[in-house]
Amino acid sequence: VYGVAVDVGSTTIAGYLVDLATGDVVANAGAMNPQIRFGEDLMSRVSYVMMNPGGDDELTSTVRDALDTLIEDLCNDLDTDLLPDDVRMHIHDIVLVGNPVMHHLLLGIDPTPLGAAPFTLTVGEPVDMRAADLDLGLPYARCHVGPCIAGHVGADAASATLNERTHATVEPQLMVDIGTNAEIVLGTAERTYAASSPTGPALEGAQISSGMRATAGAIERIRIDHDTFEPRFKVIGADAWSDEPEFAEQTATLDIAGLCGSAIIEVIGELFLSGLCDHNGVIQ
């Protein structure tokens, strides 16, 4: 018996197939969110809905189709004697999270109230339904869509908060989820604060000469030797680090063109830890 967990992001949709008997993740897959063709960020997609009659239906069907394709990829990646269609029959639960705009579009809810202050949620509570109600080819699965918090702080931040227990600590704890839309949660057992801000353009190319989206060939991990200052890195689409013999073969067909958001954050941290820049970000 399997379950599926999916983070429906503005740029990337990430999914995990879980053995419900053991709790083990047995397959994972990711895909670009095809809604990008309607708008690179959340507000441009909301604008598309406002300016195009039926635009919300287009965006809803697009993300649901992408989600069903991702589930197919998970079934294909599972190491089992079952055929992919048979694996679908053994999936009994699916949990979906995402920012409020993606949450509303996935559920077929008008996102336009989120397009201007006070950024009102039409539905913020958890939603339970049959997976088939979301046009997913999972005939025996129940679907749980996580609760949104408020404004543009969504179910993805709520699930991360529960996992990290930011809301249940004695000492203040800060949880940061940096995607196309960044969400920050600061909390203790007594009180929790949450906020969000668009960050995608800053980490995916805008004003960064070597910035790019998290696609095949993007540098995603960076380490700097604290003694020699020699860097090494990993790219999306290859398992080996740049200083390992297998790297050249694994990246032969990849166009290594820049750094995605995770690499930009890591290189700043590595520069600081190596003493190559100070706490103000000034390179020594």
Question: Predicted regions span which residues?
Answer:
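Nucleotide/phosphate-binding catalytic cleft detector across ATP-hydrolyzing
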Residues: 1-5, 10, 22, 59-88, ...
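Non-catalytic terminal/interface segments that mediate subunit docking, oligomerization
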Residues: 2, 12, 16, 280-284
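Glycine-rich phosphate-binding loop of actin/hexokinase-like ATP-binding domains
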Residues: 10, 15-17, 23-43, 113-126, ...
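Residue-level detector of alpha-helical recognition elements and their boundaries
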Residues: 37-38, 82, 111, 283
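Gly-rich Lys/Arg/Thr-decorated short loops/hinges at beta-loop-alpha junctions or inter-strand turns
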Residues: 41-56, 136-145, 248
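N-terminal leader/propeptide and maturation segments of large enzyme subunits in energy/redox metabolism
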Residues: 53-75, 79, 92, 239-265, ...
